Amino acid sequence: MTEPTRAGGTPPEAPWPSAARGWLVVGLLALASIVSQFDRTVINLMVGPVKAAFDLDDTHFGMLQGVAFGVFYVLACIPIGRLADRFERRWIIGTALLLWSLFAMASGLARTYTQLFLTRVGVAVGESSLTPAGFSMLSDHFPPAKLGRPMGAFMMSSPVGQGLAFIGGGQLLQWLSTSGVMQWAPLAGFEPWQAAFFIVGAPGLLLVPLFFMIREPARRGPGGEVPMPVREVIGVVTSRRRALLPMFAGFAMVPVVSYAIAIWTPALFQRTWDWNPAQIGWGIGLLQLTFGTCGAYFGGWLTDRFTRRGLLDAPLKAAALGFLGCGLFGGLAPLMPTAGLALALLGPALFLGNTPYACAGTAIQLVIPNRARAQVTALYLTIINLMGMAVGPVVVGLMTDHLFHDPQDIRYSLALVVAVTSPILFVLLMAACRPYRALRGTAH
Protein backbone atom coordinates (compact mmCIF):
# COMPACT_ATOMS: atom_id res chain seq x y z
CA MET A 1 0.00 0.00 0.00
CA THR A 2 1.62 3.26 -1.09
CA GLU A 3 1.01 6.95 -0.74
CA PRO A 4 -1.16 8.37 -3.52
CA THR A 5 0.84 9.12 -6.64
CA ARG A 6 -0.35 12.72 -6.48
CA ALA A 7 -0.37 13.10 -2.72
CA GLY A 8 0.00 16.87 -2.82
CA GLY A 9 -3.24 18.80 -2.60
CA THR A 10 -4.72 20.02 -5.85
CA PRO A 11 -5.15 23.80 -6.20
CA PRO A 12 -8.81 24.86 -6.26
CA GLU A 13 -8.47 26.20 -9.83
CA ALA A 14 -7.14 22.91 -11.26
CA PRO A 15 -9.62 20.99 -13.44
CA TRP A 16 -11.72 18.38 -11.70
CA PRO A 17 -11.72 14.78 -12.96
CA SER A 18 -14.10 14.16 -15.83
CA ALA A 19 -17.72 13.46 -15.02
CA ALA A 20 -17.39 10.03 -16.65
CA ARG A 21 -14.51 9.08 -14.38
CA GLY A 22 -16.32 10.39 -11.32
CA TRP A 23 -19.51 8.50 -12.05
CA LEU A 24 -17.52 5.32 -12.77
CA VAL A 25 -16.20 5.53 -9.22
CA VAL A 26 -19.74 6.17 -7.95
CA GLY A 27 -20.84 3.01 -9.78
CA LEU A 28 -18.10 0.85 -8.28
CA LEU A 29 -18.74 2.18 -4.79
CA ALA A 30 -22.45 1.55 -5.26
CA LEU A 31 -21.84 -2.05 -6.35
CA ALA A 32 -19.64 -2.64 -3.32
CA SER A 33 -22.35 -1.14 -1.13
CA ILE A 34 -24.99 -3.43 -2.64
CA VAL A 35 -22.76 -6.43 -1.93
CA SER A 36 -22.24 -5.24 1.64
CA GLN A 37 -25.99 -4.87 2.17
CA PHE A 38 -26.52 -8.43 0.95
CA ASP A 39 -23.91 -9.70 3.39
CA ARG A 40 -25.36 -7.84 6.37
CA THR A 41 -29.10 -8.03 5.52
CA VAL A 42 -29.73 -11.62 4.48
CA ILE A 43 -29.39 -12.78 8.09
CA ASN A 44 -32.55 -10.79 8.88
CA LEU A 45 -34.51 -13.37 6.88
CA MET A 46 -33.02 -16.16 8.98
CA VAL A 47 -34.45 -15.21 12.37
CA GLY A 48 -36.35 -18.49 12.76
CA PRO A 49 -33.72 -21.00 11.57
CA VAL A 50 -30.79 -19.25 13.25
CA LYS A 51 -32.65 -18.99 16.56
CA ALA A 52 -33.58 -22.67 16.29
CA ALA A 53 -30.06 -23.77 15.33
CA PHE A 54 -28.43 -22.06 18.30
CA ASP A 55 -31.38 -21.97 20.76
CA LEU A 56 -31.51 -18.15 20.92
CA ASP A 57 -34.07 -15.65 22.17
CA ASP A 58 -34.80 -12.33 20.44
CA THR A 59 -32.23 -10.49 22.53
CA HIS A 60 -29.35 -12.77 21.52
CA PHE A 61 -30.35 -12.68 17.88
CA GLY A 62 -30.46 -8.89 18.06
CA MET A 63 -26.91 -8.98 19.42
CA LEU A 64 -25.70 -10.63 16.19
CA GLN A 65 -26.57 -7.44 14.34
CA GLY A 66 -26.48 -4.93 17.16
CA VAL A 67 -23.28 -5.95 18.96
CA ALA A 68 -21.36 -8.34 16.70
CA PHE A 69 -21.95 -6.15 13.68
CA GLY A 70 -22.77 -2.72 15.07
CA VAL A 71 -20.23 -2.33 17.87
CA PHE A 72 -17.30 -3.83 15.99
CA TYR A 73 -18.22 -1.89 12.85
CA VAL A 74 -17.77 1.34 14.76
CA LEU A 75 -14.65 0.20 16.62
CA ALA A 76 -12.95 -0.41 13.27
CA CYS A 77 -14.18 2.80 11.61
CA ILE A 78 -11.70 5.29 13.03
CA PRO A 79 -8.51 3.20 12.53
CA ILE A 80 -9.57 2.40 8.97
CA GLY A 81 -10.53 6.04 8.39
CA ARG A 82 -7.03 6.98 9.50
CA LEU A 83 -5.59 4.61 6.90
CA ALA A 84 -7.87 6.06 4.22
CA ASP A 85 -6.58 9.59 4.94
CA ARG A 86 -2.96 8.42 4.65
CA PHE A 87 -2.91 5.81 1.89
CA GLU A 88 -4.61 5.04 -1.41
CA ARG A 89 -8.30 4.63 -0.78
CA ARG A 90 -8.79 2.18 -3.66
CA TRP A 91 -6.45 -0.29 -1.93
CA ILE A 92 -8.20 0.18 1.41
CA ILE A 93 -11.61 -0.59 -0.11
CA GLY A 94 -10.44 -3.47 -2.31
CA THR A 95 -8.66 -5.27 0.53
CA ALA A 96 -11.56 -4.78 2.92
CA LEU A 97 -14.02 -6.05 0.31
CA LEU A 98 -12.01 -9.24 -0.03
CA LEU A 99 -12.00 -9.79 3.73
CA TRP A 100 -15.68 -9.10 4.40
CA SER A 101 -16.76 -11.36 1.53
CA LEU A 102 -14.72 -14.24 2.95
CA PHE A 103 -16.12 -13.69 6.44
CA ALA A 104 -19.67 -13.56 5.05
CA MET A 105 -19.15 -16.96 3.44
CA ALA A 106 -17.58 -18.26 6.65
CA SER A 107 -20.80 -17.40 8.53
CA GLY A 108 -22.29 -20.48 6.90
CA LEU A 109 -19.63 -22.67 8.50
CA ALA A 110 -20.45 -21.61 12.07
CA ARG A 111 -21.28 -24.49 14.38
CA THR A 112 -21.76 -22.46 17.57
CA TYR A 113 -23.24 -19.09 18.45
CA THR A 114 -19.76 -17.81 19.30
CA GLN A 115 -18.42 -18.78 15.89
CA LEU A 116 -21.31 -17.07 14.12
CA PHE A 117 -20.82 -14.01 16.31
CA LEU A 118 -17.13 -13.83 15.34
CA THR A 119 -17.80 -14.15 11.61
CA ARG A 120 -20.27 -11.28 11.84
CA VAL A 121 -17.54 -9.28 13.57
CA GLY A 122 -15.28 -9.97 10.56
CA VAL A 123 -17.95 -8.79 8.13
CA ALA A 124 -18.42 -5.63 10.19
CA VAL A 125 -14.72 -4.75 10.32
CA GLY A 126 -14.36 -5.14 6.56
CA GLU A 127 -17.49 -3.16 5.70
CA SER A 128 -16.48 -0.30 8.00
CA SER A 129 -13.99 0.88 5.35
CA LEU A 130 -16.45 1.56 2.55
CA THR A 131 -18.22 4.73 3.68
CA PRO A 132 -15.25 6.74 5.07
CA ALA A 133 -12.98 5.94 2.13
CA GLY A 134 -15.83 6.21 -0.37
CA PHE A 135 -17.00 9.64 0.84
CA SER A 136 -13.42 10.90 0.73
CA MET A 137 -12.91 9.64 -2.83
CA LEU A 138 -16.12 11.27 -4.05
CA SER A 139 -15.17 14.64 -2.54
CA ASP A 140 -12.06 14.55 -4.77
CA HIS A 141 -14.06 13.72 -7.91
CA PHE A 142 -16.88 16.31 -7.70
CA PRO A 143 -16.94 20.04 -6.82
CA PRO A 144 -18.92 21.04 -3.70
CA ALA A 145 -21.94 22.39 -5.58
CA LYS A 146 -22.31 19.06 -7.42
CA LEU A 147 -21.44 16.66 -4.60
CA GLY A 148 -24.97 15.99 -3.32
CA ARG A 149 -26.19 13.86 -6.23
CA PRO A 150 -23.12 11.57 -6.35
CA MET A 151 -23.46 11.13 -2.60
CA GLY A 152 -27.14 10.37 -3.11
CA ALA A 153 -26.36 7.84 -5.83
CA PHE A 154 -23.81 6.14 -3.58
CA MET A 155 -26.21 6.11 -0.65
CA MET A 156 -29.17 4.90 -2.71
CA SER A 157 -27.22 1.70 -3.28
CA SER A 158 -27.87 0.85 0.37
CA PRO A 159 -31.66 0.46 0.02
CA VAL A 160 -31.09 -1.14 -3.40
CA GLY A 161 -28.90 -3.72 -1.70
CA GLN A 162 -31.37 -4.18 1.13
CA GLY A 163 -34.24 -4.56 -1.30
CA LEU A 164 -32.40 -7.06 -3.47
CA ALA A 165 -31.29 -8.91 -0.35
CA PHE A 166 -34.87 -9.21 0.87
CA ILE A 167 -36.17 -10.32 -2.54
CA GLY A 168 -33.22 -12.43 -3.62
CA GLY A 169 -32.49 -13.70 -0.13
CA GLY A 170 -36.10 -14.69 0.45
CA GLN A 171 -36.28 -16.50 -2.88
CA LEU A 172 -32.90 -18.11 -2.28
CA LEU A 173 -33.90 -19.45 1.13
CA GLN A 174 -37.20 -20.72 -0.27
CA TRP A 175 -35.41 -22.45 -3.15
CA LEU A 176 -32.75 -23.98 -0.92
CA SER A 177 -35.46 -25.25 1.45
CA THR A 178 -37.79 -26.80 -1.15
CA SER A 179 -35.84 -27.70 -4.30
CA GLY A 180 -33.80 -30.62 -3.02
CA VAL A 181 -30.55 -28.87 -3.91
CA MET A 182 -29.35 -29.33 -0.33
CA GLN A 183 -28.89 -33.02 -1.15
CA TRP A 184 -26.16 -32.23 -3.67
CA ALA A 185 -22.66 -33.20 -2.61
CA PRO A 186 -21.22 -29.69 -2.05
CA LEU A 187 -24.12 -28.71 0.23
CA ALA A 188 -24.93 -32.03 1.87
CA GLY A 189 -24.79 -31.74 5.64
CA PHE A 190 -25.52 -28.01 5.68
CA GLU A 191 -28.78 -26.23 6.44
CA PRO A 192 -30.38 -23.87 3.87
CA TRP A 193 -29.46 -20.79 5.91
CA GLN A 194 -25.81 -21.88 5.89
CA ALA A 195 -25.80 -22.41 2.12
CA ALA A 196 -27.34 -18.96 1.68
CA PHE A 197 -24.32 -17.40 3.39
CA PHE A 198 -21.97 -19.20 0.98
CA ILE A 199 -23.87 -17.90 -2.03
CA VAL A 200 -24.39 -14.26 -1.02
CA GLY A 201 -20.77 -13.81 0.07
CA ALA A 202 -19.24 -14.88 -3.24
CA PRO A 203 -20.10 -11.92 -5.57
CA GLY A 204 -17.94 -9.49 -3.61
CA LEU A 205 -14.84 -11.40 -4.65
CA LEU A 206 -15.51 -10.43 -8.29
CA LEU A 207 -15.37 -6.70 -7.50
CA VAL A 208 -12.02 -6.76 -5.71
CA PRO A 209 -9.81 -6.55 -8.87
CA LEU A 210 -11.84 -3.61 -10.21
CA PHE A 211 -10.96 -1.44 -7.22
CA PHE A 212 -7.29 -2.27 -7.64
CA MET A 213 -7.51 -1.15 -11.29
CA ILE A 214 -9.09 2.32 -10.88
CA ARG A 215 -6.97 5.46 -10.53
CA GLU A 216 -6.56 7.12 -7.15
CA PRO A 217 -7.81 10.74 -7.37
CA ALA A 218 -5.67 13.71 -6.40
CA ARG A 219 -6.54 15.09 -2.99
CA ARG A 220 -8.18 18.52 -3.21
CA GLY A 221 -8.86 21.50 -1.06
CA PRO A 222 -7.50 22.63 2.31
CA GLY A 223 -5.44 20.05 4.16
CA GLY A 224 -4.73 17.91 1.11
CA GLU A 225 -0.99 18.48 0.96
CA VAL A 226 0.31 16.01 3.56
CA PRO A 227 -1.22 13.53 6.03
CA MET A 228 -2.39 15.17 9.26
CA PRO A 229 -1.03 14.11 12.65
CA VAL A 230 -3.67 12.80 15.00
CA ARG A 231 -3.47 15.90 17.19
CA GLU A 232 -4.35 18.09 14.20
CA VAL A 233 -7.33 15.90 13.35
CA ILE A 234 -8.49 16.21 16.95
CA GLY A 235 -8.09 19.97 16.62
CA VAL A 236 -10.23 19.95 13.48
CA VAL A 237 -13.03 18.23 15.39
CA THR A 238 -12.84 20.26 18.59
CA SER A 239 -12.74 23.58 16.73
CA ARG A 240 -15.96 22.58 14.94
CA ARG A 241 -17.68 20.95 17.91
CA ARG A 242 -20.59 23.43 18.11
CA ALA A 243 -21.75 22.20 14.72
CA LEU A 244 -20.51 18.61 14.75
CA LEU A 245 -21.93 17.52 18.13
CA PRO A 246 -25.61 18.26 17.38
CA MET A 247 -25.10 17.09 13.78
CA PHE A 248 -23.75 13.72 14.80
CA ALA A 249 -26.28 13.28 17.61
CA GLY A 250 -29.12 14.11 15.24
CA PHE A 251 -27.95 11.86 12.44
CA ALA A 252 -27.59 9.04 15.00
CA MET A 253 -31.38 8.77 15.01
CA VAL A 254 -31.36 7.61 11.38
CA PRO A 255 -29.74 4.18 11.87
CA VAL A 256 -31.81 3.64 15.02
CA VAL A 257 -34.83 3.64 12.72
CA SER A 258 -33.31 1.98 9.67
CA TYR A 259 -31.80 -0.97 11.51
CA ALA A 260 -34.84 -1.46 13.72
CA ILE A 261 -37.01 -1.64 10.58
CA ALA A 262 -34.59 -3.77 8.57
CA ILE A 263 -33.96 -6.32 11.30
CA TRP A 264 -37.38 -6.66 12.93
CA THR A 265 -39.90 -5.98 10.16
CA PRO A 266 -39.43 -9.51 8.73
CA ALA A 267 -40.21 -10.94 12.17
CA LEU A 268 -43.22 -8.61 12.43
CA PHE A 269 -44.73 -9.92 9.18
CA GLN A 270 -43.96 -13.53 10.05
CA ARG A 271 -45.42 -13.38 13.57
CA THR A 272 -48.37 -11.08 12.91
CA TRP A 273 -49.51 -12.13 9.43
CA ASP A 274 -47.76 -15.52 9.04
CA TRP A 275 -45.78 -14.52 5.96
CA ASN A 276 -43.04 -16.86 4.73
CA PRO A 277 -39.51 -15.65 3.78
CA ALA A 278 -40.36 -15.37 0.08
CA GLN A 279 -43.43 -13.20 0.77
CA ILE A 280 -41.47 -11.03 3.18
CA GLY A 281 -38.63 -10.70 0.71
CA TRP A 282 -40.87 -9.54 -2.12
CA GLY A 283 -42.99 -7.23 0.02
CA ILE A 284 -40.25 -5.42 1.89
CA GLY A 285 -37.67 -5.79 -0.87
CA LEU A 286 -39.81 -4.03 -3.48
CA LEU A 287 -40.43 -1.17 -1.08
CA GLN A 288 -36.71 -0.80 -0.43
CA LEU A 289 -35.94 -0.89 -4.16
CA THR A 290 -38.52 1.80 -4.94
CA PHE A 291 -39.23 4.03 -1.96
CA GLY A 292 -35.92 3.52 -0.13
CA THR A 293 -33.80 4.03 -3.23
CA CYS A 294 -35.67 7.15 -4.34
CA GLY A 295 -35.49 8.59 -0.84
CA ALA A 296 -31.70 8.22 -0.67
CA TYR A 297 -31.21 9.96 -4.01
CA PHE A 298 -33.82 12.58 -3.12
CA GLY A 299 -31.71 13.62 -0.13
CA GLY A 300 -28.74 14.37 -2.38
CA TRP A 301 -30.91 16.09 -4.99
CA LEU A 302 -32.60 18.26 -2.38
CA THR A 303 -29.22 19.21 -0.90
CA ASP A 304 -27.93 20.38 -4.29
CA ARG A 305 -31.17 22.28 -4.92
CA PHE A 306 -30.99 24.07 -1.57
CA THR A 307 -27.30 24.81 -2.22
CA ARG A 308 -28.08 26.46 -5.55
CA ARG A 309 -30.54 28.68 -3.69
CA GLY A 310 -27.72 29.89 -1.48
CA LEU A 311 -28.44 27.90 1.70
CA LEU A 312 -25.11 27.22 3.39
CA ASP A 313 -26.80 24.72 5.72
CA ALA A 314 -28.54 22.92 2.84
CA PRO A 315 -27.58 19.34 3.87
CA LEU A 316 -28.90 19.79 7.40
CA LYS A 317 -32.22 21.33 6.40
CA ALA A 318 -32.77 18.73 3.67
CA ALA A 319 -32.19 15.92 6.17
CA ALA A 320 -34.34 17.43 8.93
CA LEU A 321 -37.30 18.11 6.67
CA GLY A 322 -37.09 14.73 4.96
CA PHE A 323 -36.87 12.68 8.15
CA LEU A 324 -39.62 14.45 10.06
CA GLY A 325 -42.40 12.38 8.50
CA CYS A 326 -40.58 9.07 8.90
CA GLY A 327 -41.60 8.76 12.53
CA LEU A 328 -45.26 9.27 11.66
CA PHE A 329 -45.47 6.72 8.85
CA GLY A 330 -42.97 4.30 10.41
CA GLY A 331 -44.61 4.46 13.81
CA LEU A 332 -48.07 3.71 12.44
CA ALA A 333 -47.07 0.95 10.00
CA PRO A 334 -46.56 -1.87 12.56
CA LEU A 335 -49.93 -1.07 14.19
CA MET A 336 -52.00 -1.63 11.06
CA PRO A 337 -54.61 -4.43 11.11
CA THR A 338 -53.52 -5.89 7.76
CA ALA A 339 -50.21 -6.55 6.05
CA GLY A 340 -51.29 -4.49 3.04
CA LEU A 341 -51.91 -1.38 5.12
CA ALA A 342 -48.62 -1.89 6.94
CA LEU A 343 -46.76 -2.02 3.62
CA ALA A 344 -48.63 1.07 2.38
CA LEU A 345 -47.29 3.10 5.30
CA LEU A 346 -43.88 1.45 5.30
CA GLY A 347 -43.19 2.76 1.77
CA PRO A 348 -43.19 6.50 2.63
CA ALA A 349 -41.41 5.69 5.91
CA LEU A 350 -38.55 4.13 3.95
CA PHE A 351 -38.50 7.04 1.48
CA LEU A 352 -38.23 9.66 4.21
CA GLY A 353 -36.02 7.52 6.42
CA ASN A 354 -33.35 7.20 3.73
CA THR A 355 -33.27 10.92 2.89
CA PRO A 356 -30.63 11.96 5.49
CA TYR A 357 -27.85 9.56 4.46
CA ALA A 358 -26.55 11.55 1.47
CA CYS A 359 -27.12 14.78 3.37
CA ALA A 360 -24.87 13.68 6.22
CA GLY A 361 -22.02 12.62 3.95
CA THR A 362 -22.18 15.85 1.98
CA ALA A 363 -22.36 17.99 5.12
CA ILE A 364 -19.16 16.51 6.53
CA GLN A 365 -17.08 16.75 3.36
CA LEU A 366 -17.92 20.45 2.91
CA VAL A 367 -16.51 21.65 6.25
CA ILE A 368 -13.59 19.27 6.93
CA PRO A 369 -10.01 19.53 5.51
CA ASN A 370 -9.14 16.85 2.95
CA ARG A 371 -6.73 14.72 4.96
CA ALA A 372 -9.17 14.55 7.87
CA ARG A 373 -12.34 13.74 5.91
CA ALA A 374 -12.22 9.95 6.16
CA GLN A 375 -11.36 10.11 9.85
CA VAL A 376 -14.13 12.57 10.69
CA THR A 377 -16.51 10.50 8.57
CA ALA A 378 -15.38 7.47 10.58
CA LEU A 379 -16.02 9.37 13.81
CA TYR A 380 -19.49 10.23 12.52
CA LEU A 381 -20.11 6.56 11.67
CA THR A 382 -18.84 5.51 15.09
CA ILE A 383 -21.26 7.81 16.88
CA ILE A 384 -24.33 7.14 14.76
CA ASN A 385 -23.79 3.40 14.72
CA LEU A 386 -23.22 3.12 18.46
CA MET A 387 -26.62 4.75 18.81
CA GLY A 388 -28.08 3.01 15.79
CA MET A 389 -26.96 -0.54 15.15
CA ALA A 390 -26.07 -1.23 18.77
CA VAL A 391 -29.26 0.31 20.22
CA GLY A 392 -32.06 -0.02 17.66
CA PRO A 393 -32.03 -3.81 17.13
CA VAL A 394 -31.37 -4.67 20.77
CA VAL A 395 -33.92 -2.24 22.24
CA VAL A 396 -36.71 -3.66 20.08
CA GLY A 397 -35.79 -7.16 21.22
CA LEU A 398 -35.51 -6.11 24.87
CA MET A 399 -38.87 -4.34 24.81
CA THR A 400 -40.54 -7.36 23.24
CA ASP A 401 -38.98 -9.79 25.73
CA HIS A 402 -39.17 -7.75 28.94
CA LEU A 403 -41.76 -4.98 28.51
CA PHE A 404 -44.51 -6.63 26.49
CA HIS A 405 -43.54 -10.25 27.33
CA ASP A 406 -45.00 -11.64 24.12
CA PRO A 407 -43.26 -12.15 20.75
CA GLN A 408 -46.52 -11.19 19.03
CA ASP A 409 -46.25 -7.71 20.55
CA ILE A 410 -43.15 -6.87 18.52
CA ARG A 411 -45.40 -4.41 16.64
CA TYR A 412 -45.59 -2.15 19.70
CA SER A 413 -41.84 -2.29 20.34
CA LEU A 414 -41.06 -1.41 16.73
CA ALA A 415 -43.65 1.38 16.60
CA LEU A 416 -42.34 3.04 19.76
CA VAL A 417 -38.70 2.99 18.68
CA VAL A 418 -39.47 4.45 15.25
CA ALA A 419 -41.94 7.11 16.39
CA VAL A 420 -39.71 8.66 19.04
CA THR A 421 -36.62 9.26 16.90
CA SER A 422 -37.60 11.64 14.08
CA PRO A 423 -38.52 14.70 16.20
CA ILE A 424 -35.25 14.27 18.10
CA LEU A 425 -33.31 14.43 14.81
CA PHE A 426 -35.23 17.52 13.68
CA VAL A 427 -34.49 19.49 16.86
CA LEU A 428 -30.79 18.56 16.91
CA LEU A 429 -30.14 19.37 13.24
CA MET A 430 -31.93 22.69 13.54
CA ALA A 431 -29.67 23.49 16.50
CA ALA A 432 -26.61 22.70 14.34
CA CYS A 433 -27.60 24.98 11.45
CA ARG A 434 -26.22 28.28 12.75
CA PRO A 435 -22.70 27.06 13.66
CA TYR A 436 -22.63 25.00 10.46
CA ARG A 437 -23.36 28.09 8.35
CA ALA A 438 -20.43 29.83 10.03
CA LEU A 439 -18.15 26.93 9.10
CA ARG A 440 -19.32 26.94 5.49
CA GLY A 441 -18.42 30.60 5.24
CA THR A 442 -14.78 29.87 6.13
CA ALA A 443 -14.26 26.25 4.95
CA HIS A 444 -12.75 27.06 1.57
Model regions and ranges:
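Extracytoplasmic gate region of multi-pass secondary transporters
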Residues: 43-44, 242-297, 354-357, 361, ...
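Helix-breaking motifs and short loop linkers at transmembrane-helix boundaries and internal kinks
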Residues: 55, 88, 109-115, 126, ...
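Extracellular/periplasmic helix-loop-helix junction of adjacent transmembrane segments
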Residues: 44-75
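Cytoplasmic helix-loop-helix junction between adjacent transmembrane helices
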Residues: 119-159
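Central cavity-lining transmembrane alpha-helices of secondary-active solute carriers
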Residues: 66-80, 286-299
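Juxtamembrane intracellular "pre-TM" segments in multi-pass secondary transporters
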Residues: 11-18, 216-248, 272
